[in-house]
């Protein structure tokens, strides 16, 4: 099953479910994320407004790209459930990237990425001035130009942890 619902949820049932599945995507508070990491199952822990999407070789790539576009552009991605990060497995990496670009995704270069990072995170917190804004506004605010028709940014990341906020 892709999604399993628990009719009467409890901490015990949630912990047991996390031990039995193939992968956990844990959202919510720090305790839930820590429980996922401790379950023995590969886990992604995310905070508020940081939904992670995984696309692998079994996915309908056009459908996945359409849904990512919708999530990134509906209400300017202001919802906490908007896709924030996309993990693409190696087998479909290039093809999926091309499909996202065909839908208006712009792959940022290292200079644009650095400027965007400075614009988004100020003193370790999200800068409210760039929340729920258009790509054109954000790029202008950050100090770089983008082609007309850019609908969302694709920011290649090279690592994880506090030094890699994307």
Task: Tell where the protein language model's regions lie, with residue ranges.
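PLP-dependent aminotransferase-like
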Residues: 1-7
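Residues that line or immediately flank small-molecule/substrate-binding pockets and catalytic motifs
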Residues: 7, 28, 90
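Short acidic active-site motifs
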Residues: 10-13
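Structural alpha-helical scaffold elements that stabilize or flank donor/cofactor-binding regions
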Residues: 16-17
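An anion/phosphate-binding loop that grips the pyrophosphate of nucleotide cofactors and donors
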Residues: 21
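Glycine-rich phosphate-binding loop
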Residues: 24-36
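ALDH superfamily catalytic-core signature
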Residues: 33-162
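Conserved glycine-rich beta-strand-loop-beta hairpin in the small C-terminal domain of fold type I
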Residues: 166
